[in-house]
């Protein structure tokens, strides 16, 4: 397959692209910084500096859209919220326009989203049919998905990746949590009762490959079948590192530090991968402690 990818130097892209190359696919990465992308991804990947030079995507078999400003790196000022939205919406709209301008469009657009689509639903078991709670993360993801779905046609199916917390050794949530936990300074956040829907990076990559190869469309919760509470996650991470994890971080401190974006760690979703499992996808990593032991070793 000839596959175009945005966000290729991000956490998921860095793990996905080597697998796609192993499988014999031809990969083109859309990037703002070709020099950086080349150093990260190597010489086997073709690079496009943006999409301005493209008038259509004829000859492209699939598009995987992973681009977007990291959501938890900065406080959510008005300006930062705008960056979070536009970094996702604009590139997605450009891809949709190119797909719709193609005589032979890609057969699939796999486009990013997040379990934040649902907002903070507390104890509710969240499948893809669950009505969302209307807050910023929902508004961001709902518009992102709505734009992507404009590419849907008889020739092009659209799959939406409602991604949970990705566990990987080289970034994501563990990139922030590992330093204090390695020092024995980790612990639950707030009450610790909030749910965390996690997925091992291997299952994330394999899930995308599954959607690439199977005639599926619509939203998919990209999460393990077994979400855990924050306090369970903290205990499991401490256990994987052979360190205590008992220093609870008060919710008040998190709110002072993060502002509105504190909802990302003080709230959560008890999300389940209902549609992936119904379609026959087999997860490799069910047990959180085993998954964490694998990524921190």
UniProtKB/Swiss-Prot annotation:
Family: Belongs to the NAD(P)-dependent epimerase/dehydratase family. SDR39U1 subfamily.
Pfam families assigned to the protein according to its UniProt record, in alphabetical order: DUF1731, Epimerase
PANTHER family the UniProt entry points to: EPIMERASE FAMILY PROTEIN SDR39U1, SUGAR NUCLEOTIDE EPIMERASE RELATED
SUPFAM superfamilies: NAD(P)-binding Rossmann-fold domains
Family matches, as InterPro entries: DUF1731 (IPR013549), Epimerase_deHydtase (IPR001509), NAD(P)-bd_dom_sf (IPR036291), SDR39U1 (IPR010099)
Organism, as annotated: Escherichia coli (strain K12)
Protein name in UniProt: Epimerase family protein YfcH
Organism classification: Bacteria, Pseudomonadati, Pseudomonadota, Gammaproteobacteria, Enterobacterales
Disulfide bridge positions per record: none
